Amino acid sequence: MAVTAVVTVAGCSHTIDGTAERASADTADPDRSFGYVDDRCGLLVDSTIQEILAADNVVRPYSGAVCQYVLSRKAGAAPNADPQPMLDVIFSWFEAGSLGRERELSQRRSAEITDIVIERHRAFLARRDVTGAACSATAAAGSGVISWWVQFRGATNAGKGDPCQDAKKLLSATLQSEL
């Protein structure tokens, strides 16, 4: 019995050569395009965005280097919950942009900045709750930067979720997507 276990363990071991790759701004293909193509923004179709954000409805009133979405979710169970919580979402790709410039702009607007790494890309979250709970997730990608911005309409986000987590999910999905 003991011999069988040793043979099984030995048969399952496997060594992989190479070294771990650190996160960096240039891990992505510099020629990769994240722009609007084939009815996709940030490489994602509308139904994927709807699924990621658990939305009941999605409308994309504008598409281009910047894509705008309006989404709605079912009302919460709380007695004072919005009848249909609304989210505003924007994807942007700045082909020749820089993460430093986007970070500086967010700081000038008094956003709360959190440095993160998403899918091995340097990134940051910028939280700024002015007209509703809002957050953007921005990463260095290709030759520039991509960003997903999510805002819950209204003064608070009680019961609506976390806009930073939603923005991170969208950014992660874009960085994972294949052309």
Regions found by a protein language model. Give the residues of each.
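Short, solvent-exposed recognition patches
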Residues: 54-122
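Bacterial signal peptide processing site
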Residues: 13-16
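N-terminal export and membrane-targeting signals
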Residues: 1-3
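Post-signal peptide N-terminal segment of mature Sec-exported envelope proteins
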Residues: 22-45
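Soluble non-cytosolic domains of exported or imported proteins
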Residues: 35-43, 61, 158-165
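C-terminal motif of bacterial Sec signal peptides marking the signal peptidase cleavage site
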Residues: 7-11
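Extracellular/mature segments of secreted proteins
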Residues: 47-52, 73-81, 143-144, 171-175
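A short, solvent-exposed beta-edge/loop patch
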Residues: 107-179
